């Protein structure tokens, strides 16, 4: 029948989107793409920035808490700027992947996934803004770590919650779109920033 509605278009009409996916999928995919852009862009630049700019004597003295942190890591003796910056990067990367457990707990027990993701986005934005100033460098890293922890696991849970459990095929395609956003952010972060 030429005037009828096809079964394929029922999902599209029900979701209100031409793609058949909920509108929220594209917002969540875009947000996660930028989170991965942030992490991999920082990964490409953090050690280089610290060695070539931040750890220069005239700049390092302005970073709040940097001397104390360096003293803590130099308990076995002095280390080069490269070694110190590599340690900072290692802690940053490790904590970015550890804190989603904390973010998941906060979402499950206190705030809910949506609020936790929003707080994560705000923390990461504030962290990148704070990176603009030498004095707040370590505080900026802390904000980025916490923001990523609040966002990382909870945003995936939100994607899953967009779809009814009865439509695994559409849900699977939605996660493919979401994963594509992750890959685009991860690939473009180091290329654009570095």
Where are the model-predicted features located?
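Cytosolic juxtamembrane N-terminal segment immediately preceding the first transmembrane helix
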Residues: 1-42
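Loop-to-transmembrane helix entry/capping segments in MFS-fold secondary transporters
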Residues: 25, 82-83, 166-178
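A gly/Pro-rich, aromatic-decorated transmembrane alpha-helix motif that marks the paired
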Residues: 44, 101-102, 184-194
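Central cavity-lining transmembrane alpha-helices of secondary-active solute carriers
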Residues: 86-106, 152
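Glycine-rich segments within core transmembrane alpha-helices of 12-TM secondary carriers
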Residues: 96, 172-191
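Cytoplasmic membrane-interface "Motif A"-like loop-to-helix N-cap segments
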Residues: 109-121, 171
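C-terminal ends and interior cores of transmembrane alpha-helices
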Residues: 119-139
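Intracellular juxtamembrane helix-capping segments at the cytosolic ends
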Residues: 150-165
